[in-house]
C-alpha cells in the first residue's frame, strides 16, 4: 500500500491541521495526489473535513516549532475547546479523496497497554492514525538508559510531556526487547524526537488514547478497501469497539 513519502508533503503541519496533515501524507503515499481535480494537500483536506481553527489561538504550536498559518482557504473558527478536526469527518475525507480505494476502520474503547502492543504489532500493512492527548506521552527525547530499561522490562519514569493538546499522530511499529516493548510514534512536528519520531511505552500510548480530559481518543486504521475486513476482525479480537469517538470538536 505504502510507497515512498511524497516530496509534495511538507515536513511540518500547519497550525491546527494535524489530522489533515496525516490524511494527506497517507493518501499521497498511496499514490493519490488530487481530489476532484484539485491538488491534494492538508489545506484541501481541512476544508473538506470541516476543520475548525481556534479563536483565539494561544498554544497550538509546541515549544521549539515554527508557527505556520499560510492557509490556502478561509477556514471556519470556533472557541478553542471546540476547535480541531472531528475523527468521523477526517475518515470520510480520506475515503472520499481515495474514491473508495482506501477504508478507515475506526477503533475505540478501553485502551490498555496490552491492546496497544497487540494492535501495533498485528496491524502490519495498515496505517494507524491515533487521536491522542499528548500530555500523557513521555517527552520525545528520553535518555538511552531509560529506553533500554523499558526494553529490559523495567517500568521507569520518562521525561515529562513536551506539550498537552489533542493531536493526531501515527503509530508506526513496535520495538521489542528481552522484557518490554516501545511504540515508534511519528509526529507532524519534526522538532520532536528524531526528525519527528519518538519512542513511547505502550502504557503511555494507552493513556494518551484514554485522554482522561472529558474527551475520547481512538485510532483510524487505514488500509486498501479490498483488504480491510481483517482490521475489523482484529479490533474485535482485541476487545475494541468499531466506531467513531468524540474528540470534542464540533465540526
Where in the sequence are the language-model features?
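Cysteine-nucleophile protease catalytic domains, especially the papain-like/related folds used
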Residues: 2-126, 223, 228-250
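Solvent-exposed loop/turn segments at secondary-structure junctions
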Residues: 25, 134-137, 190-191
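Active-site-adjacent substructure of cysteine-protease-like catalytic cores
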Residues: 112-185
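Noncatalytic regulatory segments and standalone regulatory/sensor domains
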Residues: 152-166, 170-251
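N-terminal start-of-chain detector that recognizes signal peptides
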Residues: 77, 100-103, 141-146, 154-157, ...
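Short, charged/polar low-complexity linear motifs in solvent-exposed/disordered segments
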Residues: 37, 147, 201-204
Amino acid at each position: 500500500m505504502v510507497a515512498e513519502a511524497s516530496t509534495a508533503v511538507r515536513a511540518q503541519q500547519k497550525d491546527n491541521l494535524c489530522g489533515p496533515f496525516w490524511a494527506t501524507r497517507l493518501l499521497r503515499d498511496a499514490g493519490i495526489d488530487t481530489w476532484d481535480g484539485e491538488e491534494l494537500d492538508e489545506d484541501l483536506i481541512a476544508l473538506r473535513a470541516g476543520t475548525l481553527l481556534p479563536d483565539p489561538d494561544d498554544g497550538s504550536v509546541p515549544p521549539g516549532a515554527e508557527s505556520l498559518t499560510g492557509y490556502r482557504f478561509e477556514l471556519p473558527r470556533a472557541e478553542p475547546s471546540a476547535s480541531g478536526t472531528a475523527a468521523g469527518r477526517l475518515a470520510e475525507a480520506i475515503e472520499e479523496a481515495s474514491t473508495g480505494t482506501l477504508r478507515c476502520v475506526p477503533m475505540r474503547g478501553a485502551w490498555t497497554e496490552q491492546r496497544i502492543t497487540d494492535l501495533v504489532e498485528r496491524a502490519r500493512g495498515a496505517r494507524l492514525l491515533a487521536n491522542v492527548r499528548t500530555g500523557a506521552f513521555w517527552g520525545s527525547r528520553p535518555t538511552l538508559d531509560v529506553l533500554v530499561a523499558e526494553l529490559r522490562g523495567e517500568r521507569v519514569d520518562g521525561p515529562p510531556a513536551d506539550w498537552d493538546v489533542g493531536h493526531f499522530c501515527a503509530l508506526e511499529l513496535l520495538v521489542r526487547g528481552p522484557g518490554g516493548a516501545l511504540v515508534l510514534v511519528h509526529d507532524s512536528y519534526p522538532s520532536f524526537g528524531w526528525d519527528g519520531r519518538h519512542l513511547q511505552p505502550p502504557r503511555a500510548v494507552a493513556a494518551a488514547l484514554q485522554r482522561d480530559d472529558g474527551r475520547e481518543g481512538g485510532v483510524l486504521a487505514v488500509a486498501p478497501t479490498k483488504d480491510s475486513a481483517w482490521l475489523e476482525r482484529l479490533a474485535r479480537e482485541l476487545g475494541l469497539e468499531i466506531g467513531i469517538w468524540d474528540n470534542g470538536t464540533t465540526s
